[in-house]
């Protein structure tokens, strides 16, 4: 009898464990796929670290807009702080705006504001509470870039470049896409898989 009860208990535990792992897999699978290249991204509104609301339309550049999903704590995102700041500075004069989006549930607006000041991130960083925009765009990691043309069509999606360590930099995918668009050329590589820390969703 004891042996039978033990078998039933073990079987029950296996069923529960299976349900837990299945739930975990399902949660990961709930992130929608990103829009296809060429898709139009609808306008949205998010608050900045001072709780002032900004729409995509109000911040868009006259020659295009880059959306960068960023993080306060992610070491990969932090490895790109200087490069992101330089990117925003370099392309602002060329009519391309850079907008940061923080979708991590554990990083509040105070942390976002302090982090931006510490690392001299002069571009606006919006707080995506409930990760609604991250879900809308299928963003999964930080940093992750989306480049929109003047009609808000997605023309590049993915990594900023190939290397977390700038000493190993070989391909500046995002800059190449921006330069091609500014020159009226077709972007040769419109997608390059982003890498970094997973976005911690609500």
Describe the function of each predicted region.
Residues 16-24:
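C-terminal segment of classical bacterial N-terminal signal peptides
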